UniProtKB/Swiss-Prot annotation:
One of its GO terms (cellular component) is cytoplasm. Keywords: Cytoplasm. It is found in: Cytoplasm. This is Regulatory protein RecX. One of its GO terms (biological process) is regulation of DNA repair. The gene is recX. Pfam families: RecX_HTH1, RecX_HTH2, RecX_HTH3. Transmembrane segments: none annotated. Belongs to the RecX family. The lineage of its organism: Bacteria, Pseudomonadati, Thermodesulfobacteriota, Desulfuromonadia, Geobacterales. It comes from Trichlorobacter lovleyi (strain ATCC BAA-1151 / DSM 17278 / SZ) (Geobacter lovleyi).
């Protein structure tokens, strides 16, 4: 802080950033440093925001997991990678994924995703190239190989 009761410019910049969207602690610290604030000043602002309840990695991770699972865009390993990329600590990733209820059946979500992307896809009638294309699409979204095989067998 610059004065006894005056919030620092860094803290105010962090608050402005948080009005636009959620950040993890690491991402906000990085963003503040990109705006040319010193690392120590950015750290102090982040710590203050945590104390005041404006910044919580767990809340960020829970919201992201819920949103991703709701739209079914990706799952599994891809979801872990996305959380890691956004700066969520690894121990928190495991905890949030364990505690977060998976909406519905993963096989059904994969089936729905394939139907949306490849309308009329029939694994029994598809040639090898089509099967590889759909399998790659699902794998890039974090679906396991055994689940993809199961989807193709039905």
């Amino acid at each position: 802080m610059t004065g006894s009761n005056q919030p620092s410019d860094c803290y105010l910049a962090a608050l402005r950033l948080l009005t636009g969207r959620d950040y993890t602690c690491a991402a906000l610290r990085r963003k503040l440093q990109q705006k040319r604030f010193a690392a120590e000043e950015a750290q102090q602002a982040v710590e203050r925001l945590i104390r005041e309840g404006y910044l919580q990695d767990q809340r960020y991770a829970e919201r992201l997991v819920a949103a991703v699972r709701q739209n079914g865009s990706f799952t599994g390993y891809r979801l872990q990678q996305e959380l890691r990329r956004r700066g969520v600590p690894p121990e928190l990733i495991d905890q949030v994924l364990r505690e977060s209820p998976a909406d519905g059946d993963e096989l059904e979500r994969a089936r729905h995703l394939v139907e949306r992307r490849y309308a009329g896809f029939d694994p029994q009638a598809a040639d090898e190239r089509q099967l590889r294309r759909v399998a790659g699409f699902l794998q890039r979204r974090g679906y396991r190989s055994d689940l993809i095989r199961q989807l193709f067998e039905k």
